[in-house]
Amino acid sequence: GVYIFFSLLVPCTTNEPQLQQIILEKDSDVDSLKNIIYCLKEENYFLYQTMDSLPLGSPLDTLVLSSKFGWRKKPFGGGWQKHTGTDFLAAWHDTVYATGNGKVIKSGWNVGYGRQIKISHCGGYESTYAHLYRLFVRNGDSVILGQPIGRAGNSGVVTGPHLHYEILRNDKKT
């Protein structure tokens, strides 16, 4: 430490209490700075971990919107319905990616959505991927941002192959 460095240059004796006090204060300042640097590194790491855990990534290599979130004409039977996600054009078997780090809480069949994957992310967020042809992950699996999780398809109630994508926050579709 700094104390040892200075003690090699200027021997400390009981006759030099002021010098000893200065050295102790400098050691304390260095320790404080080290602690601040450590805390900043930890906060920065936490920020990056949090950002990767939010569903902010792209679920497909190319995003072409085919149906937006909100009210739309029903594809079957006429009338209007609230569309609770976003549909993206996808060719049969296009790779579908996790949009953030998380844990798979559903990987399986849903009557309307067909083959579906739901991932729980930090902060109460969940992402849902529906109408898949193939599922690469199982319930309980951990996934990372950009990891392939399945293949696009036309399972469930659909007019053709596409990816239905949803983001939920605290169980509310957004």
Task: State where each predicted segment sits.
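Active-site acidic-Proline motif in GNAT/NAT acetyltransferases
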Residues: 90, 135, 139
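Intrinsic structural disorder/low-complexity segments
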Residues: 21-24, 124, 134, 167
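Bacterial Sec-dependent signal peptides at the C-terminal "C-region" and cleavage site
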Residues: 1-21
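Zn2+-dependent peptidoglycan hydrolase active-site motif and core
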Residues: 98-136, 161
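Residue-level recognition of beta-strand microenvironments
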Residues: 68, 107-108, 135, 152-155
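Surface-exposed, glycine-biased beta-strand/turn segments
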Residues: 21-115, 145
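Conserved, short, structured surface segments that act as functional micro-motifs
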Residues: 65, 115-121, 128, 139-174
